Curated annotation (Swiss-Prot):
Organism: Drosophila pseudoobscura pseudoobscura (Fruit fly)
Disulfide bonds: none
Cofactor: Mg(2+)
Cofactor binding, note field: Binds 2 magnesium ions per subunit. They probably participate in the reaction catalyzed by the enzyme. May bind an additional third magnesium ion after substrate binding.
Name assigned to this protein: Flap endonuclease 1
Residues at which Mg(2+) 2 binds: 179, 181, 233
């Protein structure tokens, strides 16, 4: 699910935090990619085109086709991907997973009704809703990546949290996922649409964590509380509070505890035994592998291994697989050009650095308001101190 309404809220209140670019803009960058999100995209994309690639036994192979050719495209554009796979979900996610199971059951019933009625459009719609990434899909994708010479990481828990840890440790430039909670986990850069197909012509949308904090006028802890109010995977949200009201409450009261002390409970219903504190801690201290100890290596592709893995039962064209392997080899040896900014060391962002920048911006804003008040004869309207 990610964070409900966060993307639009940032676009409305902190547009300077979003930049749209072509893929080639990220030449020379290392990027941590949410593998499960990619595999899901690949599985549903082929369905939407009216075909399901499969082995001779009927097992789907569209996830492998997508992973193979999309990864080659990234490397062709000078991007060095590292795929991060989900581990076990946190206990707090059990409620969200139960809701997904209910929606899946409803989709199965709707699919049966559509099939009985012969409604092709509805059949396709509910078939897509029933697509899910399995452990076998992930296992096959890892084997493929190893043969391609592309690194992957097994996260102990949530992939987005592990991606964010890699970014904060300076191992990669950004997290690539469609789930906005990568920002809540503290990824300083988030890339959306990076793994979309070229045919969709979607520019890559880059979110800057520091700029969104500045635009929303919050620090990192307040941003986490905002995301919990908006709606996340780990606890319920307060009914009746939408994005606009959520940011107003955070700007006025700065944390959920103070919001609850001042909330009009005749208007808003707070969930019983609300686990927002545990959800907050999960975002602050997620279960991740030590990013500083992770060694990312891009190696030579195994052409014969790729042919053996993808052809035969999986029915990939040997000619196309060998051409793909040649592109992998070429990209591995062609990246001699470097980004100018790679000559300068960029220190990872810290909460103190973000808060210092925020204080500086507030002081400048306050100074400007005071000058305006003196010239107009009126009083400047201040904000509640943090």
């Amino acid at each position: 699910m990610g964070i409900l309404g966060l993307s639009k809220l940032i676009a409305d209140l902190a547009p300077q935090a979003i930049r749209e670019s072509e893929m080639k803009h990220f030449f020379g960058r290392k990027v941590a990619i949410d593998a499960s999100m990619c595999l899901y995209q690949f599985l549903i994309a082929v369905r939407s085109e009216g075909a399901q690639l499969a082995t001779v036994n009927g097992d789907p192979t569209s996830h492998l086709m997508g992973m193979f050719y999309r990864t080659i495209r990234l490397l062709d554009n000078g991007i060095k991907p590292v795929y991060v796979f989900d581990g076990k979900p946190p206990d707090l996610k059990s409620g969200e997973l139960a809701k997904r199971a209910e929606r899946r059951e409803e989709a199965e019933k709707a699919l049966k009704a559509a099939t009985d009625a012969g409604d092709d459009a509805e059949i396709e719609k509910f078939n897509r809703r029933l697509v899910r990434v399995t452990k076998e899909h992930a296992r096959e994708a890892k084997e493929l990546l190893s043969l391609m010479g592309v690194p992957y990481v097994d996260a102990p828990c949530e992939a987005e949290a592990q991606c964010a840890a890699l970014v904060k440790a300076g191992k990669v430039y950004a997290t690539a996922t469609e789930d906005m909670d990568a920002l809540t986990f503290g990824s300083t850069k988030l890339l959306r649409y990076l793994t979309y197909s070229e045919a969709r012509k979607m520019p890559v949308k880059e979110f800057s964590y520091d700029k969104l904090l500045e635009g929303l006028e919050v620090n990192n802890r307040e941003f986490i509380d905002l995301c919990i109010l908006l709606g996340c995977d780990y606890c319920e949200s307060i009914k009746g509070i939408g994005p606009k009201r959520a940011i107003e409450l955070i700007n006025n009261y700065r944390d959920i505890e103070t919001i609850l002390d001042n909330l009009d409970t005749s208007k808003y219903t707070v969930p019983e035994n609300w686990n927002y504190k545990v959800a907050r801690e999960l975002f602050i201290e997620p279960e991740v592998a030590d990013a500083s100890a992770i060694d990312l290596k891009w190696t030579e592709p195994d052409e014969e291994g790729l042919v053996k893995f993808l052809c035969g039962d999986r029915q990939f064209s040997e000619e196309r697989v060998r051409n793909g392997a040649k592109k992998l080899f070429k990209s591995k040896h062609a990246q001699t050009q470097v980004r100018l900014d790679s000559f300068f060391k960029t220190l990872p962002s810290t909460p103190n650095a973000v808060n210092a920048a925020k204080r500086k911006a507030e002081e400048a804003k306050k100074s400007a308001n005071n000058k305006k008040a003196k010239t107009s004869g009126g009083a400047a309207r201040g904000r509640r101190p943090k």
